[in-house]
């Protein structure tokens, strides 16, 4: 029987090592295994494949489970950050979740149009201005003249995302989500030393200003979730 409902499986990739971790339903790391990168990030994907070849069967035996889904945490410095903003004249329209979704989708699509070698991993709403005044979106139900959204996008190269998805698929493993360690550390500063616990907090929806995309029914991610859930 699969234990996917009880466990979350993570692979953290940094310049020194590959770390596999199993986080159980008590939010404790019940299993971990690491692999030293002798050449740093130069042969990262070759080393990850070697890790799977040499260890995957033993890991599954130890866990008494087949690993079908996994979360990948990139703890590397070659991600791209971009700050973007959009100003929208509302005229007689009221600000609502549909309009916010529409504007955030437009920002993401425009970024993809001009940076098509990048994959957006994280999108965060930095600031919302209504008629020049900073507002909390969760409380807005009003008519205004203009709305300004400021967002931060954090990205990886499309090629990097494609390669790791393909590699995992060779072992019948699907990637649930790719995360960036620097983003997690910024979101949960000083709360934990282990990046896996930060990732789990993030996936549980405790980051109120994060924009989430999902292909499934929306999951509640705090009071911002009705504004910031998207469908591919």
Q: What kind of feature is each model-predicted range?
A:
Residues 1-17, 25-30, 34-66, 74-232:
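Nucleotide/phosphate-binding catalytic cleft detector across ATP-hydrolyzing
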């Amino acid at each position: 029987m699969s234990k996917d409902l009880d466990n979350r499986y993570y692979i953290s990739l940094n310049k020194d090592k590959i770390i596999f971790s199993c986080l159980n339903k008590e939010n404790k790391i019940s299993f971990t295994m690491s692999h030293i990168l002798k050449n740093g990030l130069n042969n990262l994907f070759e080393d990850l494949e070697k890790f799977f070849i040499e260890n995957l069967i033993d890991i599954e035996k130890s866990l008494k489970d087949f690993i079908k889904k996994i979360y990948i945490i990139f703890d590397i410095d070659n991600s791209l950050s971009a700050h973007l903003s959009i100003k929208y004249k509302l005229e007689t329209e009221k600000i609502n979740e549909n309009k916010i979704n529409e504007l955030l989708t437009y920002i993401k699509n425009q970024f993809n149009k001009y940076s098509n070698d990048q994959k957006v991993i994280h999108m965060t709403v930095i600031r919302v201005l209504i008629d020049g005044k900073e507002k909390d979106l969760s409380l807005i139900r009003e008519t205004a003249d203009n709305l300004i959204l400021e967002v931060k996008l954090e990205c990886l190269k499309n090629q990097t995302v494609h390669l790791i998805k393909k590699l995992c698929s060779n072992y019948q493993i699907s990637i649930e989500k790719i995360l960036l360690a620097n983003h997690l550390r910024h979101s949960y500063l000083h709360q934990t030393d282990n990046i896996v616990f930060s990732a789990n907090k993030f996936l549980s929806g405790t980051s109120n200003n994060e924009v989430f995309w999902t292909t499934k029914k929306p999951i509640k991610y705090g009071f911002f979730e009705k504004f910031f859930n998207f469908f591919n």
